[in-house]
Design a protein with these regions (language model features):
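Phosphate/NTP-binding elements of NTP-utilizing enzymes
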Residues: 188-228
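Conserved Lys-Pro-Asp/Glu-containing loop-to-beta segment of HAD-superfamily phosphomonoesterases
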Residues: 118-145
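Structural recognition of alpha->loop->beta junctions
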Residues: 105-120, 165-180
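Acidic, Mg2+-coordinating phosphoryl-transfer loop and its flanking beta/alpha structural elements
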Residues: 136-171
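Active-site neighborhood of HAD-like aspartate-dependent phosphohydrolases
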Residues: 1-54
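Substrate-recognition element of Asp-dependent hydrolases with the DxDx(T/V) motif
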Residues: 65-69, 74-107
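Short catalytic/ligand-binding loop motif for oxyanion handling, primarily in non-cytosolic enzymes
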Residues: 15-18, 88-90, 97-101, 127-129, ...
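Short, surface-exposed acidic-centric catalytic microdomains
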Residues: 32-82
Length: 228
């Protein structure tokens, strides 16, 4: 098994920033915007009556970060990955004003097994070396030299992940599948060669795969000579 360096975004990848953000703005300004109304990375387009300063104000308020909840299974999968011997690093583009509250009220509260030593603050995530990056923002994945896992969110549903060398993952079970596939690539190729007639049964019974699409994408990319 390959020991991997796994890079992980925070907002809307391991925790629900957008849900809390929309709720906060609705309550503060008497609005009724829904999470499903967010179709773009620029959240301001969903709040046309507010200024950008009003929209982004909650992010620099310490109390706001106490309302953020973790995404299901994110903690369990990341802890499992570390127990498997993989290195897990949080890579967040957070503003410096939010770091202390965000770390204390979100990351270290819900992911206590992750150390501050394993946190990178970076806006240009492509400059950080790793084997996998999991992120909901396509622009953070584009151009990076790693397996690119795009976490599905409302703002990226229309983005063509596969055309841009990315694998779309819908939840943390998909992420776990991808980690297994990358770490055990050679073993899986060999096993599939021996089970050409029933590859799906082999993957389900021997490796526990349920959603095979992320795995198939990674395998195809590796067979073609890379992950870009």
């Amino acid at each position: 098994m390959r020991q991997l360096k796994i890079l992980v975004d925070m907002d809307d990848t391991i925790e629900y920033l957008l849900f809390a953000w929309v709720d906060c703005l609705n309550e503060r300004y008497g609005l009724s915007v829904k999470y499903s109304d967010i179709h773009e990375w620029n959240i301001c387009t969903a709040f046309p009556t507010l200024t950008a300063e009003q929209v982004y104000a909650p992010l620099v308020e310490d109390d706001f970060w106490t309302t953020i909840k973790p995404i299901p299974d994110a903690s369990e999968v990341l802890q499992w990955a570390m127990e498997q011997g993989h290195e897990v690093y949080i890579v967040t583009a957070s503003a410096y004003e939010t770091i202390k509250s965000k770390m204390e009220n979100v990351l270290f509260k819900y992911f206590p097994f992750i150390s501050w030593k394993n946190v990178f603050i970076a806006h240009h995530k492509q400059m950080i070396r790793g084997d996998i990056l999991i992120d909901d923002a396509p622009h953070n994945l584009e151009g990076g030299d790693y397996v690119k896992l795009l976490m599905t969110a409302n703002h990226n549903r229309s983005y063509d992940a596969s055309a841009n060398g990315m694998i779309r993952v819908n939840d943390w079970h998909d992420v776990r599948n991808c980690i297994v596939a990358v770490a055990h690539e050679d073993e899986l190729k060999e096993g599939l060669a021996e089970h050409k007639e029933n590859p799906v049964d082999y993957l389900k019974n021997e490796w526990g795969f349920v959603n095979l699409l992320p795995f198939q994408a990674i395998l195809l990319q590796s067979m073609l000579g890379g992950t870009n």
